[in-house]
């Protein structure tokens, strides 16, 4: 006797949770849209973001990997975004979410208001495994905290009254290596030894987290005038090719600083490169550089100070590679 086919069991659809965060900013929507649309600047502008690496770009669509601080840990996921400069809208969707999140999407909207102001609306939609209430609460808490930090940083930068391109700048220094690039990478990765080996580092502690490929780095740096300042950084290490970092605690003249150390084999031989992206804090210019200093002076000062220290690190890394 033929048994009747079993009736398929339909599983309930996961609950879609929504959040919305807004802020009103004294800046035009075009400038704010441009800041959000350029994801390469995010690590220096948006404090939770540690590093971004593009996977693909085609027209108004882009895919990238992103590392960000979430609930005190460094999370990693892949996202797809669609940019709409006419509507001033940026939509996003995570391609691979981090458990317990099973999906995450949303968008940035920039609404022009009177007197040149803009309302920024940041929306999220997400689902979690098994609709776990505790997981939902954790995700909502993380979204509340990180959205407030992102919107606050965006407002602070845009409301300085200076063009973004005068506040946020990047530069790169490259050094040829006589030894293997892998050995130079190892020197930079093992930052806990820097205080013994680098003259501009007074103290440095490194705590590894998660898989051991992420680090929290706290460092006291000696400046040219002999004073010291303390920075705290999140680092992503991918041996033997690159180390990316984002400063969570910055010196007075800097509102954001991210960077990347890369180690590569070129047709001319192995090289090591240090790249910096810096957001200047205009409110610190007079205190640090004097009453007559300008934004251009601040950029030049930071280019010299940061470049000098990272080149010193690269030279010691090159020497270590040559000895290995």
UniProtKB/Swiss-Prot annotation:
<dbReference type="InterPro" id="IPR019587">
    <property type="entry name" value="Polyketide_cyclase/dehydratase"/>
</dbReference>
<dbReference type="InterPro" id="IPR023393">
    <property type="entry name" value="START-like_dom_sf"/>
</dbReference>
<feature type="region of interest" description="Disordered">
    <location>
        <begin position="1"/>
        <end position="21"/>
    </location>
</feature>
<dbReference type="GO" id="GO:0017000">
    <property type="term" value="P:antibiotic biosynthetic process"/>
</dbReference>
<comment type="function">
    <text>Is needed for correct cyclization of the oligoketide leading to isochromanequinone formation.</text>
</comment>
<dbReference type="Pfam" id="PF10604">
    <property type="entry name" value="Polyketide_cyc2"/>
</dbReference>
<protein>
    <recommendedName>
        <fullName>Granaticin polyketide synthase bifunctional cyclase/dehydratase</fullName>
    </recommendedName>
</protein>
<comment type="pathway">
    <text>Antibiotic biosynthesis; granaticin biosynthesis.</text>
</comment>
<keyword id="KW-0045">Antibiotic biosynthesis</keyword>
């Amino acid at each position: 006797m033929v048994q009747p086919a079993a009736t398929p069991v339909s599983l309930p659809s996961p609950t879609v949770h929504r959040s919305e965060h807004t802020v009103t900013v004294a800046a035009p929507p075009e400038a704010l849209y441009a800041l959000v649309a350029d994801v390469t600047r995010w690590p220096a502008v948006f404090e939770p973001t540690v590093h971004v690496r593009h996977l693909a770009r085609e027209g108004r669509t882009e895919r990238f990997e992103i590392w960000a601080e979430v609930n005190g840990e460094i999370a990693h996921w892949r996202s797809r975004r669609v940019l709409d400069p006419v509507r001033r809208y940026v939509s996003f969707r995570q391609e691979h979410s981090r458990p317990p999140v099973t999906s995450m999407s949303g968008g940035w909207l920039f609404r022009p208001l009177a007197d040149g102001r803009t309302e920024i609306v940041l929306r999220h939609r997400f689902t979690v495994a098994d609709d776990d209430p505790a997981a939902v609460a954790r995700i909502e808490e993380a979204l509340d905290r990180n959205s407030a930090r992102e919107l606050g940083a965006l407002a602070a930068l845009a409301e300085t009254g200076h063009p973004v391109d005068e506040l946020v700048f990047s530069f790169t220094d490259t050094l040829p290596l006589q030894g293997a690039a892998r050995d130079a990478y190892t020197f930079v990765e093992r930052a806990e030894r820097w205080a013994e080996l680098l003259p501009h580092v007074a103290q440095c502690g490194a705590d590894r987290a998660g898989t051991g490929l992420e680090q929290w780095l706290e460092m006291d740096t000696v400046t040219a005038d002999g004073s010291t300042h303390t920075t705290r950084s999140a680092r992503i290490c991918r041996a033997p090719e690159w180390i990316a970092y984002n400063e969570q605690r910055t010196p007075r003249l800097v509102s954001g600083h991210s960077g990347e150390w890369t180690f590569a084999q070129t047709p001319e031989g192995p090289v090591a490169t240090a790249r910096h992206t810096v957001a200047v804090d205009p409110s610190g210019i007079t205190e640090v550089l004097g009453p007559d200093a300008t934004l251009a002076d601040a950029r030049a000062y930071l280019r010299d100070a940061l470049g000098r220290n990272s080149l010193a690190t690269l030279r010691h890394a090159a020497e270590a590679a040559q000895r290995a």
